[in-house]
Amino acid sequence: MQLERLPSIAFKSPAIALSGVVDYEMYTKFRTQFDNASEEKIVVTEPSTLGGDPEVARMMGEDIRFASEMEPHRRFVFLGKAAIYSAGTTFMSFFARQNRYLARGTRLMIHERKLSKKLVVL
């Protein structure tokens, strides 16, 4: 599904504004703001984070993914500001590609997962 690019005005007052470490405290703030935005057609989530707990990021992301599937008439948008590191990029990955935006100058950090290679000798 191709969505139109949102104009700048759509980001004036984000429904969800998060900053700091991705942790259970951030999740609580996220859920409170997310629940308060239940009537909004466009729900902008504006995080800035240097990282944190990837499993908490996945919990927030699953909330976004589930709401996107259950309420297709609503649009859930990510607007990264300043820094989106580590767990922040995990969270961003749950938003549809056409709903991922970054403010000018925002930095992303994406970790490469290295798997050890174990040889099995027969």
Language-model segment annotations:
Residues 1-122:
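Terminal-region recognition feature
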